[in-house]
Amino acid sequence: MGSNSTSSAESNCNATYLPFQYSLYATTYIFIFIPGLLANSAALWVLCRFISKKNKAIIFMINLSVADLAHILSLPLRIYYYINRHWPFQRALCLLCFYLKYLNMYASIFFLTCISLQRCLFLLKPFRARNWKRRYDVGISAVIWIVVGTACLPFPILRNAGLANSTDSCFADLGYKQMDAVVLVTMVVIAELAGFVIPVITIACCTWKTTVSLKHPPIAFQGISERKKALRMVFMCAAVFVICFTPYHINFIFYTMVKESIITSCPTVKSTLYFHPFSLCLASLCCLLDPILYYFMASEFRDQLSRHGSSVTRSRLMSRESGSSMVN
């Protein structure tokens, strides 16, 4: 395949141009930006300042929020491009924003998997949870950032084909670098296995194990409410994973084969290309769903939000009363 984004399969099936994708991306990112920025900023503030460091998965939640904010902060540039269809900035900024999209996706996948796995293991082996150190989670998080950050580098590199420093194209309009088919297929298989199949199997197993544990008698100091909390947490992780990341990774296999003209059937080519923008938009929705995850997962998180909301309301009422008394 050449350095443009059009394969022979796309040309033969007259599916080289998808005008609806610009308005779809712009609308989705506008919908996500303000709520996502406010929710994740508030979540990060509460998680860092008020949640007990003994709370299970707190480190993973903080890192998940950071990953979401990294993507959210790049959304205004994406919105500008999809509305104007013109990129007036440097090539490096385009590729950085493109990179942050996939960094957010795969960092979120691994941190959700860690939250689910840790909650399940601590439920089944509560004595291990008591001896677990916070620095272990910090170390695991650092490894995830290094591995995911390195593994996501091919995304902007492979889309850097023919992109001059003064180009006005970015994001969905970026070209593809020519690659050997064997190398590309190998990369896709590794990405699908490590970035989707293994995490989804892990989360599914955690959900099943946690559900089964409810049928067994509680262990020592562990009550039924603790088990229900764990199940709720694991279910929320699974829900975010299925809604946001499963559609993209299922379609990604077909999308790659269409781009390499391995798939040439026009109905399949068109449906794959048409669904691709929707799957990417669903992946970005994790920035809105993750703060809901924190709310339902940590009772301290809910308490702190309630207390902060009450204090803000009281301060506003007091300022109004003082203002009215001065007038009177």
Swiss-Prot record:
Cytoplasmic topological domain residue ranges: 49-56, 113-137, 204-233, 299-328
Disulfide partners: C94-C170
Extracellular side: 1-27, 78-91, 159-182, 255-277
Glycosylation sites: N4, N14
Pfam families named among the record's database cross-references: 7tm_1
Topology in membrane: Multi-pass membrane protein
Domain of life: Eukaryota
GO molecular function, one term: G protein-coupled receptor activity
Transmembrane segments annotated in the record for this chain: 28-48, 57-77, 92-112, 138-158, 183-203, 234-254, 278-298
Gene Ontology cellular-component annotations: plasma membrane
Cell location: Cell membrane
InterPro entries: GPCR_Rhodpsn, GPCR_Rhodpsn_7TM
Keywords, in A-Z order: Cell membrane, Disulfide bond, G-protein coupled receptor, Glycoprotein, Membrane, Receptor, Transducer, Transmembrane, Transmembrane helix
Coarse class of the protein's main subcellular location: membrane
Entry similarity comment: Belongs to the G-protein coupled receptor 1 family.
Functional description taken from the UniProt entry: Putative receptor for purines coupled to G-proteins.
Name the UniProt record assigns to this protein: Putative P2Y purinoceptor 10
Organism: Mus musculus (Mouse)
Organism classification: Eukaryota, Metazoa, Chordata, Craniata, Vertebrata
Gene name per UniProt: P2ry10
